[in-house]
């Protein structure tokens, strides 16, 4: 009888594993997607600077305009273009990311922004942030309802059924309390990704 219940929870564990991996890949793709905004923000800064120097632009000859266009192509590799605090706030708000005012610098160089999106091993703090995405009521546990909420938000139909979520929780629940605590979550993350 036990082998039957463990074999029926195996596909659900695999499903949960798939959902979690998909979620992490989504986060990674979002980071990569956002890294593509750096050139856009650089271009925006150039356009803004050009508008402020309108008088100077009017005095340029056609030859100088062509040279400037060529120089703009060369400037793509330069790190001298900054992103303002307001631009960083706008991007973070549009992504639904929250921040404290003291966490943001007045300006960021293109190199600093680019380094935010480099691939690196997840730190314990990043794993905690991922755990907090699931732990809506902040009680230190992920229960089936919280898991269901996240999987539904991510668009997984199987996650919309509470019974499926209960089976997923049971498959990871080492102490059999019906919830996943942070240590169980870390253990799952270590076995899934490392």
Swiss-Prot record:
Residues 52-81 are annotated as: Disordered. Residues 52-63 have a biased composition (Basic and acidic residues). Ca(2+) 2 binds at residues 173, 175, 177, 179, 184. Residues 76-98, 122-157, 160-194 form the EF-hand domain. GO terms for molecular function: calcium ion binding. SUPFAM superfamilies: EF-hand. The keyword Calcium applies. PROSITE patterns: EF_HAND_1, EF_HAND_2, S100_CABP. Keywords: Calcium, Metal-binding, Repeat. Ca(2+) 1 binds at residues 135, 137, 139, 146. Residues 64-81 have a biased composition (Acidic residues). InterPro entries: EF-hand-dom_pair (IPR011992), EF_Hand_1_Ca_BS (IPR018247), EF_hand_dom (IPR002048), EF_hand_pair_protein_CML-like (IPR039647), S100/CaBP7/8-like_CS (IPR001751). Potential calcium sensor. PANTHER family: EF-HAND CALCIUM-BINDING DOMAIN CONTAINING PROTEIN (PTHR10891). This is Probable calcium-binding protein CML45. It comes from Arabidopsis thaliana (Mouse-ear cress). The gene is CML45.
């Amino acid at each position: 009888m036990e082998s039957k219940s463990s074999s029926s929870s195996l596909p659900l564990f695999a499903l949960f594993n798939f959902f979690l991996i998909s979620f992490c890949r989504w986060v990674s793709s979002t980071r990569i997607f956002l890294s593509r905004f750096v050139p856009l923000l650089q271009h925006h800064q150039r356009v803004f600077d050009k508008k402020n120097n309108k008088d100077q632009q009017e005095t340029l000859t056609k030859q100088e305009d062509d040279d400037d266009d060529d120089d703009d192509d060369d400037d793509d590799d330069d790190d001298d273009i900054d992103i303002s605090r307001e631009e960083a706030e706008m991007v973070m708000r549009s992504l639904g990311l929250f921040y404290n005012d003291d966490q943001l610098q007045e300006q960021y160089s293109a190199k600093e922004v680019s380094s935010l999106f480099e691939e690196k091993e997840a730190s314990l703090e990043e794993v905690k942030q991922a755990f907090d995405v699931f732990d809506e009521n902040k009680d230190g546990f992920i229960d089936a309802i919280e898991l269901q909420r996240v999987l539904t938000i991510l668009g997984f139909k199987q996650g919309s059924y509470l019974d499926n979520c209960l089976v997923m929780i049971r498959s990871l629940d080492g102490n059999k309390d019906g919830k996943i605590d942070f240590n169980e979550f870390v253990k799952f993350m270590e076995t899934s990704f490392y």
